[in-house]
Curated annotation (Swiss-Prot):
Gene name of this polypeptide: rps16
GO biological process: mitochondrial translation
Entry similarity comment: Belongs to the bacterial ribosomal protein bS16 family.
Keyword Glycoprotein applies: no
The name this protein goes by in its record: Small ribosomal subunit protein bS16c
Amino acid sequence: MVKLRLKRCGRRQRATYRIIAIDVRSRREGRDLRKVGFYDPIKNQTYLNVPAILYFLEKGAQPTGTVHDISKKAEVFKELRVNQTK
């Protein structure tokens, strides 16, 4: 099963995160299937590759709680529902 989750990057005490699609059995720093976004909690910046996220969600990927909250704030799930009703 594939999950959308955060991968820690950056320096000590200055964490940034990549949002990645990764196999659920892999460790946090393991090899990812694809990078689908970026999140910096200190600067409060977020970049999401929405088509890639929608692709993985349609294939059955499950977002973690934090990734779900970030995606919800960016209104990614509204686009998912629009695509499903077509």
